[in-house]
Amino acid sequence: MRKLNNMEVRNMSRKIVVVGGVAGGASVAARLRRLSEEDEIIMVERGEYISFANCGLPYYIGGVITERQKLLVQTVERMSKRFNLDIRVLSEVVKINKEEKTITIKNVTTDETYNEEYDVLILSPGAKPIVPPIPGIEEAKALFTLRNVPDTDRIKAYIDEKKPRHATVIGGGFIGVEMVENLRERGIEVTLVEMANQVMPPIDYEMAAYVHEHMKVHNVELVFEDGVDALEENGTVVRLKSGSVIKTDMIILAIGVQPESSLAKDAGLALGVRGTIKVNEKFQTSDPYVYAIGDAIEVKDFVTETETMIPLAWPANRQGRMLADIIHGHTDSLYKGTMGTSVAKVFDLTVASTGVNEKILKRLNIPYEVVHVQANSHAGYYPNATPVLIKLIFNKDSGKIYGAQALGRDGVDKRIDVIATAMKANLTVIDLPDLELSYAPPYSSAKDPVNMVGYAASNIVDGFVDTVQWHEIDHIVENGGYLIDVREPNELKQGMIKGSINIPLDELRDRLDEVPMDKEIYITCQLGMRGYVAARMLMEKGYKVKNVDGGFKLYGTVLPERVVY
């Protein structure tokens, strides 16, 4: 039972200063007032807007959101009145004086400064776009970053007035990909340049391959494993490190964000990974009277328990509310970490993930197993069912779920949300098949895709099947591995994995004489399910068998150049 020491809190009247608004700052200020009418609460915001829908900004640029006013979640006037807050916009905190417990505030329009005392100081400065020192960047006349409403206004005004024909987006993270879509919505040709070999870092390469395929369908030019060497001719020419040249009318720089931690650093507060502000489980910095929340802080990864930076709106909002509770005496409120659950729209595709990916687990030397399952978003016999591909990453011995990724046109978000909830509750892959999820033909199947991926993972944990991954099978076949494709002959026109032998599943029992007993057998099909059935059949006959996880569909999407016909 959570305990709040009400009498002690109510007898105290404190001056609480919140630095920064939007998700974290606005959330903590509102909750603080709901918990106490006595405290003096001051919110100091460098910009003009204290609370806006930063995740909606690309969609206003693209014309999907048509009313600018809808981006403004709270105005200064409305929030001041409702919550009795002293809100000071266009005011920047330039110094923290820890010993005196004061801050120095600068009016950004007049440059005048003054000091303000505090009993409790809360930092919610957020994160800012990374702007590297690219030669020619200062001379680029149509180069933009996207963080706030003024940035949005500048980009939209440029598009409306100049009507650019081509845009270059540098960076393939969430903001970059969302900007690509919304620029295409405006009829602008787009080239995306990304240093890595994929978009959207939270998902793994093979899942991103589906996103790449979808973006190409929407006429987006993708340039991977290349960076910007220089901007020339006032930013109308982008010269890449490979020597390639892109002629463009505008540039969106979206290579990532860095924490706004200089204020904390100058005050001597301890910093963490990537320059984040280091905090404990109660959001206290190295100074017990100074707290920090939001994109600028170091958080614990819920899965690996390592320190990291996860700049997302969900954690910032929850941290704000929790910190207000902590300040008001909730003795057992502790922040247990962030899983980084996220979702993004990429044209007609929804892409979501939770937990950690393979890249992180490899870096930390944590052993793991992977399974891919493709199932319909709802019952296949009900109209308009579309495939959902789910990737589950887990511990083969314990069944602990490390992470999940999913993509499709419909029903993706709710599947990831269910798995995220299971992870938070410390459920294992063995528990997923028993989750009693809502079912009716328009919404799901009697065995939901979450149940199905649980069955597939449980089969591995229980030893009913072994698998190999899409990136392993070519090497195996090249070194003498015996690969059977159990699809029907008419399916082979889609292509095959080089070196595979076709024995349709329903003929396999009658053709066992063609399957050598002295070799390990590998099975592939279209998606993996028939491969599992074939693997079980052969295992019962005494064969050593492994199933190609995800089947030919996964292999062919990720490695189309290796498919044979």
Protein language model features and the residues they cover:
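Glycine-rich dinucleotide-binding loop and its adjacent helix/turn
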Residues: 123-186, 221-222, 279-281, 501-505, ...
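Rhodanese-like catalytic fold shared by cysteine-dependent sulfurtransferases
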Residues: 430-441, 445-472, 476-482, 489-520, ...
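Beta1-alpha1 glycine-rich phosphate/pyrophosphate-binding loop at the start
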Residues: 11-92, 130, 180-203, 332, ...
